[in-house]
Each structure stands twice: as structure tokens, then as C-alpha cells.
UniProtKB/Swiss-Prot annotation:
This is Pyrimidine monooxygenase RutA. It comes from Enterobacter cloacae subsp. cloacae (strain ATCC 13047 / DSM 30054 / NBRC 13535 / NCTC 10005 / WDCM 00083 / NCDC 279-56). The gene is rutA. GO terms for biological process: alkanesulfonate catabolic process; nitrogen utilization; uracil catabolic process. It catalyses: uracil + FMNH2 + NADH + O2 = (Z)-3-ureidoacrylate + FMN + NAD(+) + H2O + H(+); thymine + FMNH2 + NADH + O2 = (Z)-2-methylureidoacrylate + FMN + NAD(+) + H2O + H(+). One of its GO terms (molecular function) is uracil oxygenase activity. The lineage of its organism: Bacteria, Pseudomonadati, Pseudomonadota, Gammaproteobacteria, Enterobacterales.
Amino acid sequence: MKIGVFVPIGNNGWLISTTAPQYMPTFELNKAIVQKAEHYHFDFALSMIKLRGFGGKTEFWDHNLESFTLMAGLAAVTSRIQIYATAATLTLPPAIVARMASTIDSISGGRFGVNLVTGWQKPEYDQMGLWPGDEYFSRRYEYLTEYVQVLRDLWGTGKSDFKGDYFTMNDCRVSPQPSAPMKVICAGQSDAGMAFSAKYADFNFCFGKGVNTPAAFAPTAARMKEAADKTGRDVGSYVLFMVIADETDEAARAKWERYKDGADDEALSWLTEQSQKDTRSGADTNVRQMADPTSAVNINMGTLVGSYASVARMLDEVAAVPGAEGVLLTFDDFLTGVETFGERIQPLMQCRAHIPAITKEVA
């Protein structure tokens, strides 16, 4: 099973809480995290894109770096780990993304890929005059289909004459082309999103579900496999989890309870309000799960809380789910979390038994 780190491009990572670690996103922080991840043989690092935050006492995600420029910098200071940036496709023409991706491919030596997102939070785009209207919710994957076709043309042949409803290319050129096949990833959980990933993505991200229920996402992975089978392609699921680990189950649980007690209700209210704006998509979209009050303090990603041995066991359960090819991990404290994962959790995982024993990173 592949292991990736979802780097904290926004302030405070993925905990909407006054009692969680409070920090700003910086290049130096993310460099330290990704270099540690590479040292411990993580397979990939991904950054999201967020253009407006949730506010509240913690000013959650009000402070964000930009994904492509961050990952270009990280590509230059790493040598093995795969690097993915996220394109907010309403803000960037596909020909520009194709050229930026080709540039980072050159920086990284063929280790770069692109995560495509359609956009769900209207204020991110409306503040720049780029929101196309609420009808976009129901046609966003039509838009993304044209977008990825332009990308594939330009990366594959260096030229595009694509003509569609949203994009018109007139002998558009991009050169040099990438040195390695450019992987495209997506995070669709709606039927339309999965159909898109089945046809165009190399793999699909999905949310884990619940607290210490590592296999609860299995129906989502099964839906993705069913959609991919219809296209004759192999598109695996990579599952998002937060790891909160400590020496004992009790110590880890105490941290989790403390984070929940400090939930930033004002920021969470913003998330709930924005999630209700999309009345066109189905109930199975990512944003619906993010705003569920069950575990909104960490956006309802699957959460693994326990001792190092308990977390290792639960991750092995994830690996056993049909269609699960990898996990994307967040941590309550990223620097400590990546290190303890590499030294205390990964060596106990049967699905990572092929990874050699790794000594502590030398500063």
C-alpha cells in the first residue's frame, strides 16, 4: 500500500480547533515535513489549494500558500518522493497548467503529477469574479472533462486544437513535454466524480470514515472499482486519514478528546453554510461528508486514534480493503507525526514490510 502525506498548505492543518497546534503555513515547514517523509520512504506528497478560509477564532485556512509554486520548491529539495500539486481549474487555463506541470516535471526529474479540482466553495471564486454561477454545480464535470482532454493533448503531443463548450484551442503548443507520463488524480465521490475518475484519472482520492473504523470506506472503494470496470481501466482508491498516535491508546484518545473540546464553532458554521450551497450534486459528495457534525473538527476525514501498534494494525486493515491502493495521511502535529510514523508505526505494518528499517533522520 502506498503512503502519502497531505502537506499543511493552510494554517493549522486539518484540525478546526483552538486546542490543536496553531501554526502558519511556510515553505520551511513544508520542506521539513516532505524531506522527513522522503527519509521514511513515503511514496508521495500532495498539497491542496484553498483560496478563502473559514474564519472563526482560529482563522481556519485564512492563510494559505499556493500549490504549484510550493510543490515546485519542494521538488527542488527532494529526490525520490512523488510530488502532486492541485489545480483549481476555475482559476487556471488548462494550457497554463500543462506548461507549469511540464516545468515542475523538469525540476523534479519526472516525479510530478496534478490533482484536478472543480471547486465547491463559491466565495473562493466569487471574490475574484470567477464564479460561473450556481448552475456550475451540476455541470462541473462536463467542464473538467474538456479541461483534462486539453491537458492530455498538450502533454501527449505538444499541441491541441480542441474545440468544446468551455475551451477552444487554436494550434495551442506546449514544449518541452513532460519527461514521464503525467499522472492525473481526482477526488470524486459523487457518481459524476467517480465516472470522471474512472475515465481520466490514474487514481481517485476518497475520505476515510469514522473514528477507528478503518474499513468503513469500503463501499466507496467498491463504487470506484465498479465505475472503473465499466471503462476497462484500473483506477484505485487512495484514502484520506488523520493519524493521532501516542505511546498508549489512552494517551492518544486524550489528545483527540482535547481537540474536539476546543472545536472552533464559528469556523465550523461557515463550513456547514458553504456545504449547503450546492443543491445540485448528490448526497455522496466530499463536501457533504466534510460538514457532517459527527467529526467536523477534522472535516470528517477518517481518524485513527491509538497507540503506535493500534494505528499500524488499523492501517493494515485499510490495505486489506479491495480497491484500496494507498492512503493519504494528515497528522495533528506533522513534524512529530511523520517521524513517529516512520519510526514507530510503519515498521509494525505488514503491508509495509518491504520498507527497510530506517534510522532517525539526521538534522
